[in-house]
Structures are given as C-alpha cells and as structure tokens.
C-alpha cells in the first residue's frame, strides 16, 4: 500500500511522520545544503532543517530522499541524510548531486514496483532473505543501465529494437 501525503509546513510534517507506521518514507521535494550550514528540505518554498525535528519525529527504518543534495560530497556532515539517521532511520537513500525530477520519479516508481513485486516474491514465494544493500544496489545498477540505453537511443547510437533487446538483457 502506498499512501501519499502532501504537507505544507513543519508542523504538518511532524504530524504525518508521527502518525506513520510504514517501513518506508519517501520525501519527493526540493532539497539542498547551505554553504556553511546544514542540509534542508523545502516545504511550500520554506527551507526546513531536519535537525530542528530531532526528538520531535518518529522516523521509519527506511528513508528515501528524492531531492537534490541530500548527502553532498562537498559539504559538511550536517546533511539531510545524516539528520534522518540521527532521527532513527536505519538506512537513508540520498543524492550527492542535483537530480532531475523525471529520472527521480522513474527511480521511485521502479523502487515501489521492486518492493511490491520482486521483494515480495523473493521473501514469501522463494522464502529467501535479501540484504537491503543488495536490493538497492541491484536496482540502482538496473536504473543506470536503463537510463544509459535510452540516452544511446536518443543520440542515435542504437535503434528502438536494440534498446528493447538491451533493456531485456539488463533487467
């Protein structure tokens, strides 16, 4: 089950998180990191520092951040990703660089499909466990190759039939 919540401000965010019993929370919004400060997410054009929510929110074990610069490699450790870890998340998927909204949306859709179908089959039909890192890294590799294949087609290096064959092979 996927439940979508749009929040307008910090108090709504706190309420939604504290009333959430899901294993995964996905934040699909603008994000960033100030030059000398900390990472932030943007709600209704207002930057929210996750550190200001520490001790006020209940965080699910898995947090997915579909927002730019939520774990930047060129700034301090006060990133959005690290703040969610401090708030109680067991794992956080974040971006080190700016991301494109279309590709981020496709990635999130693939993640939701992979969780609901692949993970379910793997765990309950085959009775096998899988490490979260293996699950995510496999999906990320597949997403990378899919984007690369589409880029090759856009640049006229391969045709549509080759795109289909390569995507079938990769996925």
Label every PLM stretch briefly.
Residues 1-27, 32-53:
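Functional beta-strand-loop-alpha-helix junction segments that form "active/interaction loops"
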Residues 31-32, 37-39, 55, 88, ...:
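Residue-identity detector for glycine
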Residues 61-171:
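Active-site-proximal C-terminal subdomain of hydrolase catalytic domains
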Residues 22-28, 58-60, 95-96:
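Functionally constrained cores in energy, signaling, and assembly domains
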Residues 18-20, 51-58, 79-88:
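Mature extracellular/periplasmic domains of secretome proteins
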Residues 21-24, 33, 57, 88, ...:
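Alpha-helix capping/termination and helix-coil
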């Amino acid at each position: 089950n996927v439940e979508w919540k749009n929040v307008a401000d910090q108090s709504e965010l706190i309420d939604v998180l504290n009333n959430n019993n899901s294993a995964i929370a996905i934040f699909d919004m603008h994000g960033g990191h100030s030059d000398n400060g900390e990472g932030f997410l943007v709600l209704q054009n207002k930057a929210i520092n996750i550190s200001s929510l520490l001790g006020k929110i209940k965080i699910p074990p898995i947090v997915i951040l579909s927002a730019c610069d939520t774990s930047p490699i060129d700034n301090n450790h006060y990133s959005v990703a690290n703040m969610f870890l401090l708030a109680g998340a067991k794992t956080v998927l974040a971006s080190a660089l700016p991301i494109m909204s279309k590709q981020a949306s496709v990635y999130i859709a693939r993640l939701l499909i992979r969780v609901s179908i692949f993970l379910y089959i793997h765990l309950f039909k085959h009775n096998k466990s899988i490490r979260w890192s293996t699950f995510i890294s496999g999906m990320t590799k597949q997403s990378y190759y899919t984007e690369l294949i589409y880029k090759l087609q856009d640049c006229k290096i391969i045709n549509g039939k080759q795109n289909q064959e390569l995507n079938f092979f990769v996925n």
